[in-house]
Every structure is written in structure tokens, then in C-alpha cells.
Amino acid sequence: MSEMEVEKPDLTLYNTMTQLKEVYKPMNPGKIGIYVCGITAYDYSHIGHARAAVSFDLLYRYLRHLGYQVTYVRNFTDVDDKAKNCGEKPLDLSNRFCEEYLLDMAALQCLLPTHQPRVSDHMEQIIKMIEKIIENGCGYAVGGDVFFSVDKSPSYGQLSGQRLDHTQAGKRVAVDSRKRNPADFALRKAAKSGEPSWESPWGHGRPGWHIEFDIHGGGADLKFPHHENEIAQTCAACEDSGVNYWLHNGHVTNNNVKMGKSLNNFFTIRQIAANYHPLALRHFLMSAQYRSPLNYSVSQLESSSDALYSLSPYREEMSGDVGKTQQSAEAKEMIKKVKNALKFINVSISKLKKMQKKQRMSLVVSLVEVEKAVREVLDVLGLLTTLSYGELLKDMKQKALTRAGMGEEEVLQRIEERNMARKSKDFRRSDRIRELLAFKGIFLEDVPGDTVWRPSTPLTKPKSGLGLGMTAIVFAIVFTFLGFFFYSR
């Protein structure tokens, strides 16, 4: 093994095709190719789309962390018929929502894929592939449409576990009588009024939903028929499908019903981001094992927001006023907490003075390594923000005020009323004001000489304490997400 070929730790993935956890063996040592089905771009993306993006972004980050050279491809299906209902040119509509999707992905701190192909840019390759499928006897043209013959694919249904005689074609839509088998699917559709179309040997038309491109990923709902059809047509055009591992993330549900636009039971990424920091949404989307369903929950989003806040040191941006050096009460309290932590460390070290110098140095190195390890884990999880702490905390406070339906002036007024009650020893009123704010997700913290507030999970019933310590949050995140996506050994 050369110096450049560093041995990678084993990576174990659950393969939908075999329904087993398998040790990943790349086709080319040190290199991994991932293809993930992207969105059909005709509207703002919902949090179900976000879960797929975050799940595979986590895999992408982890593989790079392990030292693999990763080629990550996520497509845009920009060929659709929704534009005719919007009075907008089809490609203009899709281009607009491709860009909106990329803004959402940036907010969620999803890394840009290596390539982001659009269907409309690859019509020539698609036509050549269809011609190859027909040439191999696996496809047939009828009246400008081209269908794939599932009878020519002996393994059809293997990925999803669907038997060919149980695919229930026609259950949701009428069966096209021109098909040789009701389960046959369209490789290309003849042009219709108001829809985008391209010239081909079979006339003007557009590709069906199943012409796309190691690892193939997507949402669980794509297993059948989308991915099943991909396998069938790719095998028909090429000797080898080129996919060894199939990964599928679970649905996001609303009241335990799959979230989707057809049921109008969804929330867009933008809607959630209007009330919560996008990284709180990312944290929420990673809060369950990636193949399991994830039920939408305001309380869970609140908990994720609280965790994100607790991970951020309590630092405020310096004032722009020249010569102003006075520290805020919150900053002073944070310094006090840091000093207490340092005092604890100093006491601990003083007890170890009798140790040999080498042992003491080992302790210091260990502390540095712990901090480094935590940062590495948070980076792999995509939770290290590029914002300054001041910018992050300011944004999270503003969104907490939005959720509470309050302005900061109103919160400060309540704090002043509470301070007056405390001075007059009306502790019942003081506690009541604090509790009422806590019910709205505004947590008051008394620090020397002042009272400050921070976002928190809304209080649902009286209790003695609120929030989690930063240390507890860090370790909870580390141990929760180490088993989120992968198993390495």
C-alpha cells in the first residue's frame, strides 16, 4: 500500500436491495460515487424534501471525513406540466424553483453536490438511451409514446419487494390499453398542449419519470415504481446497472400520515425557517434514525432549537461604538461560568500535582483532543455555523419572539415589572411573570445585577428548572447521531 493509499475504516450501510447491513466496498479504492434523486422543481420544497437532502448530506460529509474522494450527484427534474397552471413558461418556472431550492439547501448547511444535472440539459443522452432500450427489445413505441416492457426484466420488483402480478396497475389511474402489460411504464411521452417538449425519433415529447443515472439514494416512496423502473431500464440499456447499494430515507409524517403536496398536509422549508433557525430544522431532521419515519412535532422543533442555542457560547457582538468597553450582564455571567469551570479544572489538576510531568501533559492533551473531537462531530453533522455567535444568537432570539408573538420591548417591560415585584418582595407576582414568559418560550435568567432572557422550549407545566446544560447537549448530540446513519468499525 502506497503512502497515498490510507486504509479506510469499514463502513456498514443498510442496502435496500438485500435488506441487509453490508460492509461497503467501493468499485474504485478510495473513491465513492453517490447519486441521489432530487426534486421536481415547480414549487417551494417541503420538509420531506429537506429530510432526504439532510440525510444524504450527512452521508456525504461522513464519507469525506473518512478520507474518501466522493463524487456526489443530485439531479433536478425540471421537466413537468405544472407550469401551465401558473401562467409561466415551463423552464422559467423550473429554473426559479431550482434556485429557491438551492437557497433552502444553503440555509440548512447542505454542502453543494459535485454535480447537479438538469433533465432538460441531457435530452440527447436520454434519447440515445431509449433507442438502445428499443434496440435491445425491451421497449416499444406507440403513437409518439415509448413504453418499457417489464416482461423483459426478470428481476423487476426485486428492490421494492413488489411482484409483477401484484403491482396493481390501474388502481389509481386508468390503464393505457396500448400497453402490452398494464405495468409497462413510459420512457417518453408524446407532447401535450402547454407542456415542454423536445424533438425525437418518435416526434415531439418529453421523457417519463424514470430516466436518471456504488450508491443510489432517495426517499422511501421512490423505491416503487421510480427506482424499480430505473434499474429495469438501465439494465436494458447496459449490461451492468452500476449500482451496488441502495439507500432510502424514511418519510416525514404529519399526524403519522406521510407529508406530501397531494394531501396538502405539508410545511415548506421556508415556513419552518420563518419561525426557527434552519439549523434547528436540520437538528430535528436528524433526530431519528434515517430510515425511520419522522413525525412532525412543534415540541421536537422547540427542543432542537433549544439544543442549538445551548451549543452556542453566550457571546454577544461587540458594540460598534468606539471606546465602548462595558460588558453586558449576560457576557459577565458567561465569564463567571467560564471562571467557575476553570476553577473546577484547576482544583482537579491541583489534586494531580503529584503526578509525573508526562502524566500531567497527557491530561492537557486529552482535554484538547476532546474539544477537537466534539468540533469534528458537529462539523460532520453540519451543525457548525459560518455565522458569528452574535449573528446566530440574534437570529434565534428574533425567531423566538416571533413564535411567542411578542416584541423585545414587551419582554423587557415584563422583566422590569418582575424586578419591581422582587424589590417589593412580591415573589408570587415575580414568579408568575417568569412562568408566563416561560410558557411562551422566553426563559429569564437572573445574573448579578440584571436579568437576561434567552429562547427555550416552552414550559408546558410548572417545573423547577428549564433548559439543558451545554455539556449535556453536546454529549446527547454526539451519542445520538453517531448511530444515525452509519456504523463504522
UniProtKB/Swiss-Prot annotation:
It is found in: Cytoplasm, Cytosol. ATP binds at K261. Its cofactor is Zn(2+). One of its GO terms (biological process) is cysteinyl-tRNA aminoacylation. Zn(2+) binds at C37, H226, E230. Keywords: Aminoacyl-tRNA synthetase, ATP-binding, Cytoplasm, Ligase, Metal-binding, Nucleotide-binding, Protein biosynthesis, Zinc. Binds 1 zinc ion per subunit. GO terms for molecular function: ATP binding; cysteine-tRNA ligase activity; metal ion binding. Coiled coil: none annotated. GO terms for cellular component: cytosol. Its EC number is 6.1.1.16. It catalyses: tRNA(Cys) + L-cysteine + ATP = L-cysteinyl-tRNA(Cys) + AMP + diphosphate. It comes from the Eukaryota. A motif ('HIGH' region) lies at residues 39-49. A motif ('KMSKS' region) lies at residues 258-262. SUPFAM superfamilies: Anticodon-binding domain of a subclass of class I aminoacyl-tRNA synthetases (SSF47323), Nucleotidylyl transferase (SSF52374). InterPro entries: Cys-tRNA-ligase, Cys-tRNA/MSH_ligase, Rossmann-like_a/b/a_fold, tRNA-synt_1_cat_dom, tRNAsynth_Ia_anticodon-bd. Belongs to the class-I aminoacyl-tRNA synthetase family. This is Cysteine--tRNA ligase 1, cytoplasmic. It comes from Arabidopsis thaliana.
